[in-house]
Amino acid sequence: MAARVLAFLLALALAWPAAAQQAPLSDSDRAAIRDVISRQVEAFRRDDGNAAFSFASPDVQRLFGTAQTFMDMVRKGYRPVYRPRVFDFGNIVEMNGQPTQRVHVVGPDGRRVNALYPMTRLPDGSWRIDGCFLQSPEEHQV
């Protein structure tokens, strides 16, 4: 009896990560994710802080508080995505339980970087950007 209970608990523990994973993204989800990111980058190019901030997740909005504070951070620390010369979408992978869009970017200085955009789905089904991480192309690929 104890062996059966132990076997059941082991099977449950092994199945837990699979059950906790999100359902695969649909083609429309992938398109929506890319659209949100594209629209934010276009807002950066126009210096439209309110529009750019609107594509950030509620957590990111709480963290920065205002569109102005958010834009100041982007201008100072995220120059490649603020003023990209090239902005090419790569694949979407799962990182830390979130769909994460990889983008190959050439910044205004000609330097290549990979931008990783973790995404979050809101209760209404829409997608928002939950952060952005820049890495050099030489760094470990996701």
Model-derived segments and their meaning:
Residues 7-15:
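Bacterial N-terminal signal peptides
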Residues 23-24, 31-35, 49-98:
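Short solvent-exposed beta->alpha transition segments
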Residues 91-142:
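Exposed beta-sheet edge and beta->alpha loop/turn motif
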Residues 29, 36-37, 43:
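N-terminal capping segments
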Residues 1-5:
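Positively charged n-region of N-terminal signal peptides that target proteins for export
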Residues 40, 44-51:
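Short helix-adjacent coil turns
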Residues 16-20:
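Sec/Tat signal peptide C-region and signal peptidase I cleavage site
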